[in-house]
UniProtKB/Swiss-Prot annotation:
Xref: Pfam families: zf-RING_2
Tissue: Isoform 1 is testis-specific. Isoform 2 is expressed in heart, brain, skeletal muscle, kidney, pancreas, lung, liver and testis. Isoform 3 is expressed in heart, liver, and kidney.
Lipid bilayer topology: Lipid-anchor
Source superkingdom: Eukaryota
Gene3D superfamilies for this protein: Zinc/RING finger domain, C3HC4 (zinc finger)
Name recorded for this polypeptide: RING finger protein 141
Gene designation: Rnf141
Originating organism: Mus musculus
An example Gene Ontology molecular-function term: zinc ion binding
Location(s), subcellular: Membrane
Alphabetical keyword list: Lipoprotein, Membrane, Metal-binding, Myristate, Zinc, Zinc-finger
Keyword DNA damage: no
Lipidation sites (N-myristoyl glycine): 2
Length: 230
């Protein structure tokens, strides 16, 4: 019976527009993801990106933000920090924070791309060819994807309008969609997290300023404990 329902659900998803189907699949996957599987994916991304970017000047480091996964509702509050680091100096060049939904998107993008790159390298007629030569700086390209995911947040309902409101559970929506929903409901349309009051329910999402980002990156560099050697 369960398998039949699952097959029917997949059939419906297959008939949806590609963009909406991808969103539904990601939401379903994040809902069934266990904490151990999540930690495994963070470790896997570190391994995969290290292999593909071997021999390059920069690399990415994925870490769960300390304290963000301690709640019983870790899926709505957990944050993954993606940091681009210069290997020779240890200096943090860029840093971004992702929620679980954004992380799963990135995980799928990177593992899919990396599989192709590593397969191409293994079948190359020149075995000495470095897989990292496929791109000049793979870490920078991936960091650009992280920036796109965290900057261009779309409404979780219509998948069209730019999100300008974010709930405490980190799901974001455009003003038009959330106005219609909040007229009758006091919970999140995606995860159903209950909102306690009008003042706490709908929080305007403000992008960090350049000063905020600069201070954050400097703090990350200090915590890395590796001084810059010009």
């Amino acid at each position: 019976m369960g398998q039949q329902i699952s097959d029917q659900t997949q059939l419906v998803i297959n008939k949806l527009p590609e963009k909406v189907a991808k969103h539904v699949t990601l939401v379903r996957e994040s809902g069934s993801l266990t904490y151990e599987e999540f930690l495994g994916r963070v470790a896997e991304l570190n391994d995969v990106t290290a292999k593909v970017a071997a021999g390059q000047e920069k690399h990415l480091l994925f870490e769960v933000q300390p304290g963000s996964d301690s709640s019983a509702f870790w899926k709505v509050v957990v944050r993954v920090v993606c940091t681009k680091i210069n290997k020779s100096s240890g200096i943090v060049e860029a840093s971004r924070i992702m929620n679980l939904y954004q992380f799963i998107q990135l995980y799928k993008d990177i593992t899919s791309q990396a599989a192709g790159v590593l397969a191409q390298s293994s079948t190359s007629e020149e075995p000495d060819e470095n897989p990292s030569s496929v791109t000049s700086c793979q870490a920078s390209l991936w960091m650009g994807r992280v920036k796109q995911l965290t900057d261009e947040e779309e409404c979780c309902i219509c998948m069209d309008g730019r999100a300008d409101l974010i709930l405490p559970c980190a799901h974001s929506f455009c003003q038009k969609c959330i106005d219609k929903w909040s007229d009758r409901h006091r919970n999140c349309p995606i995860c159903r997290l209950q909102m306690t009051g009008a003042n706490e329910s709908w929080v305007v999402s403000d992008a960090p300023t350049e000063d905020d980002m600069a201070n954050y990156i400097l703090n990350m560099a200090d915590e890395a404990g590796q001084p810059h050697r010009p």
